[in-house]
């Protein structure tokens, strides 16, 4: 249980170090009426899918880039990209393509440099360790990009909750939960 306690402490430190204005900007983005598209590679892509699912439960129209049923993105749509490094090839290519359509592109990353790109209309910088272990990153007992992926999952789930008018939305969200299992 020491490892679990250490990971929980890492999450507390990382999540409380997130810029409050960036976080609130993401919450406001989620309140929008447009369609939401999510993209990410590897474990970050799995987190993106989990967040897309939860946002769908909240009543939003949501798609995951790369799925066969994902339609074309358009001007009033929002693309949320998860990339720990902020430079993952496919995620950045998807961001550029979406930006060209006029869609709003929002990046969730550890990289303060990546957010300088004019492709991104907004960002949420999570000050977590990456697989590169760059100077200035927090220490972690976890391998690779675990710290970023876990913090992204916690923060984005929290942002969905904060975006809801009714904080106790469980019953309403259950209506959108699968009933085929």
Language model regions located:
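Short, well-ordered alpha-helical segments in soluble proteins
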Residues: 127-130, 163, 167
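Hydrophobic packing residues in well-ordered alpha-helices of helical domains and bundles
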Residues: 4, 23-26, 48
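A short, well-structured juxtamembrane/interface segment
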Residues: 17-32
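A short, charged, Gly/Pro-tolerant segment at domain boundaries
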Residues: 158, 164-181
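Generic N-terminal amphipathic, Lys/Arg-enriched alpha-helix
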Residues: 1-16
